[in-house]
Regions:
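Gram-negative outer-membrane beta-barrel transporters
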Residues: 411-418, 426-427, 524-535, 556-679, ...
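Surface-exposed extracellular loop regions of Gram-negative outer-membrane beta-barrel proteins
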Residues: 253, 366-368, 373, 380, ...
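Membrane-embedded beta-barrel scaffold of Gram-negative outer-membrane proteins
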Residues: 188, 296-314, 462, 468-474, ...
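Extracytoplasmic beta-strand/coil segments of soluble accessory domains associated
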Residues: 74-120
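N-terminal periplasmic "start-of-domain" segments of outer-membrane beta-barrel proteins
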Residues: 34-68, 94-97, 113
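Short acidic/polar hinge/loop motifs at secondary-structure boundaries
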Residues: 113, 118-144
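C-terminal beta-signal and adjacent terminal beta-strands/loops
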Residues: 477, 671, 675-677, 698-763
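Transmembrane beta-barrel wall of Gram-negative outer-membrane proteins
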Residues: 178-207, 212-251, 273-296, 352, ...
Length: 763
């Protein structure tokens, strides 16, 4: 069924391109063919995209990134249409999502967006993004299925980050910022450039006490790059980053009442996870050579390491069976270690009306998980005691991936260019679990292999020197995780089953768009518009629903299966102007309709999902609070046709910049997000909000002949102190009272008005 679906979607998209392609071929007989180049690369973004790119793409260079003085990545990406990111914990925790894909999931799942840093595909255990903002040279967002270039998890697109490098990093720099809730930031940077080399070293630290109870965070990062010209045509560059991070709870509270009366969470003090200690290490060695003015070679080798420990699953009952809400009472200590190593190589060549690129991508990944009981606990008041220190799980996943990919771009006339991409991934996954009490002392050794093909077909046509239209169809995929494949091997629960026959999740993206450069009332503006649809068929769901209890035979036991379907469609609009009459403007608008197309097996748990399942509780049982603390039932829902939660139907970001005098910039931003559903059954709402953000910046050259420059800035987010929720997530009866309502929704209240100011001294 999946293959038929994929073929039908691709055929429909390509038929839609056939008419303009045929027209262009006829025109080519009488018109000079256009010279084209391949600008896509899975290694390096040195090739600027041009008007022959058949997808939506937004790029921020270093000056744009630095001008915003952003505290987190979403403050930059808000101006990108289609970004539906999860933002939590004073903005320190971000999961980037695009066009509503994967917004229904909110735990440690992958986000459906490939994150690539200097050619290194980065996957972090929690699915969050830990990118050092102080080390960013460039950010690029590619929307639509992008597995044709980046492979696994590029269901909705990719975010490509390029870190600082090159001669532009020469000189000395010192930054110091202060802000609300104990926010502090410092940066030291030193760089040098000669005729054949450029190098820099940088230290950055950020910390804050946090608005929420137990929400402190800190990050200390060393980074650097050495770039050396081997000769006139080749270059070698070594980049590294070493980061030690800590963050505590995300700031969530349970229920709308707590969000209103206790937004800091002082009376709760517990989220599902807390006490994250994260050590990240990344290095990459890149080589490039221009063979001639029409062809070049690129290669990179890399390693990325992530060592993370954290607490999860707050205890509901202590070892004596008494209810507990102590902030130290968590049941699980998680120790996660991963190492991602790989190498990529690309060759590209231009033959006037034809351009080709081919590459190979080799990866060796190791993921190790160990979970132990942090404290002694019971899951029900009279259940068995799990002693502290009990080894709950100890497993390792090894992945070996080999991929070949390529792109062909060819002119069909003076104004029309077609693009074709193909990629094949071969992946071998091996899963080993030690014999521990948590899995009944069973030793597990198993595995699975996958072969996945990804494609893109695109067309661009220049209507004039200032405007063009484009269309494309592309695919994205995500491999099943080890948990989804082999979960039944790691538990003693007979109702939890493995499914080694799972297929990779697939997505088909179709997009039609237009770009135009035009003068509006004196302002030179670039305008963009796109119409898109992303279809997912047979995506992976638990047979009991996304986050339902695993202790029931409803749904045939708890097993991950290819049984879900979803569709995201919408319109994206953006506009940016150059400065004119001391003003410049930006606008980004998104109109999104994201729905489940197949999801008839959703179950909402009422009561304690770790207790005993009762299919049809009596009236007396339903009225007894003690019953719900030790038992539960489920309510079935058919979510087919319902909106995917946390996907607002409308988003708007408007920015204005005023330049009243040389060196001065005053900025304002209106950030609007419509309301959406907080749960899959579309019962509880996440209200919308409109926020105003303000900023001022002044840069001046200091007296004397040193060439030193001083930059001062101040920024106020949520200037009117509007109270709203950063995120809202509902799934089951969190209070164990037999009712699912707004008091069960996990909510992160917004901290309100936040201010920051700082200075930067540069030599």
């Amino acid at each position: 069924m999946l293959v038929e679906f994929r073929n039908r979607a691709l055929l429909a998209a390509l038929c839609g391109l056939a008419a303009p392609i045929a027209w262009a071929q006829e025109s080519a007989e009488t018109t000079t063919l256009r010279r084209v180049t391949v600008t896509d690369s899975a290694i390096e973004d040195r090739f600027d995209a041009d008007d022959t790119d058949p997808v939506s793409r937004v790029r921020f260079d270093a000056p744009e990134v630095e001008r915003q003085h952003a505290k987190n990545l979403i403050e930059i990406l808000r101006s990108v249409p289609g970004v539906t990111a999860d933002l939590q914990s004073d903005g320190e925790t971000i999961k980037i999502k695009l066009r509503g894909i994967e917004n229904q999931r909110f735990r440690g799942e992958k986000p459906g967006v490939a994150i690539v840093v200097d050619g290194v595909p980065v996957f972090e255990r929690t699915g969050k993004v830990n990118v050092d903002l102080d080390n960013i040279e460039r950010i690029e967002v590619v929307k639509g299925g992008a597995s044709y270039l980046y492979g696994d998890d590029a269901l909705a697109g990719a975010v490509i980050v390029t870190t600082k490098r090159g001669a532009g990093q020469r000189g000395l720099r010192f930054d110091a910022d202060r802000g609300a809730f104990g926010y502090r930031r410092h940066l030291l940077h030193a760089g040098h450039a000669g005729d054949a080399f450029a190098a820099h070293l940088q230290y950055a630290e950020r910390e804050q006490a946090g608005y929420y109870f137990l929400s402190s965070s800190r990050a200390r990062t060393w980074s650097g790059n050495l770039q050396y010209a081997l000769d006139d045509d080749s270059e070698l560059a070594l980049g590294f980053e070493r980061s030690a991070r800590f963050r505590d709870r995300e700031g969530s509270v349970t229920g709308v009442t707590a969000a209103r009366t206790d937004p800091r969470g002082r009376n709760e003090g517990r989220g599902y996870t807390r006490n994250f200690d994260v050590d990240l290490t990344r290095w990459n060695l890149r080589w490039s050579r221009d063979l001639d003015e029409r062809s070049n070679l690129l290669a990179v080798v890399y390693e990325y390491r992530d060592e993370t420990t954290y607490w999860s699953a707050p205890m509901r009952f202590d070892a004596s069976g008494r209810p507990t809400t102590n902030v130290l009472d968590y049941s699980t200590l998680n120790d996660y270690r991963q190492a991602q190593r790989g190498a990529k190589a690309e060759y590209r060549a231009t033959f006037d009306a034809l351009a080709l690129m081919g590459g190979i991508d080799l990866r060796r990944n190791v993921f190790e998980n160990e979970a132990t009981a942090l404290n002694a606990f019971r899951t029900t008041p009279r259940g068995a005691v799990t002693p502290a220190g009990t080894l709950l799980s100890d497993d390792r996943t090894r992945e070996r991936m080999r991929a070949a990919y390529g792109e062909a771009k060819f002119a069909l006339g003076a104004s029309t260019v077609a693009t074709l991409n193909v990629r094949r991934d071969l992946v071998d996954a091996e899963f080993d679990a030690a014999a521990v009490p948590g899995n009944g002392h069973r030793r597990v050794s198993t595995g699975r292999s996958f072969e996945v093909d990804s494609y893109r077909a695109g067309l661009t046509h220049a209507l004039s020197d200032a405007s063009s239209i484009f269309a494309s169809a592309s695919t994205g995929f995500r491999l099943p995780s080890a948990e989804q494949l082999f979960r039944g091997e790691t538990t003693t629960n007979a109702l939890v089953r493995s499914n080694p026959d799972l297929r990779p999740e697939k997505a088909i993206s179709v997009e039609f768009g237009a770009r135009r450069s035009v003068r509006l009332a004196g302002w030179q503006a670039t305008l963009g518009a796109s119409l898109f649809q992303i279809d997912r068929d047979d995506f992976i769901l638990d047979s009991n629903g996304e986050y339902a209890s695993s202790n029931t035979t409803i749904g045939g036991g708890s097993q991950f299966r290819n049984i879900g379907g979803a569709r995201s469609r919408g319109i994206e609009l953006d506009a940016r102007t150059s400065p004119h009459r001391s003003w410049a403007f930006e606008a980004a608008a998104t109109f999104l309709d994201a729905r489940f197309t197949r999801y008839d097996n959703a179950f909402v748990s009422l009561g304690n999902g770790n207790g005993s399942f009762v299919a049809d509780p009596s009236a007396a049982q339903r009225a007894d609070p003690a019953f719900w603390r030790s038992n539960y039932t489920v309510v079935a829902h058919d979510n087919t046709g319902k909106r995917i939660p946390r996907t607002p139907s409308r988003m708007l970001d408007l920015r204005a910049h005023w330049f009243p005098a040389p060196g001065w910039t005053v900025s304002g931003e209106i950030d609007y997000r419509a309301g959406s559903w907080a749960d899959e059954i579309n019962q509880e709402r996440w209200p919308g909000r409109t926020l105003l953000h303000l900023g001022v910046r002044h840069e001046t050259k200091l007296p004397g002949g040193s060439g030193a420059r001083l930059l001062l800035f101040a920024r106020v987010d949520n200037a009117f102190d509007r109270r709203h929720w950063l995120i809202a997530r509902g799934a089951n009866d969190a209070n164990f009272d037999g009712v699912y309502d707004g008091e069960d929704v996990s909510i992160v209240p917004d901290p309100g008005r936040i201010w920051r100011f700082g200075l930067s001294l540069r030599y």
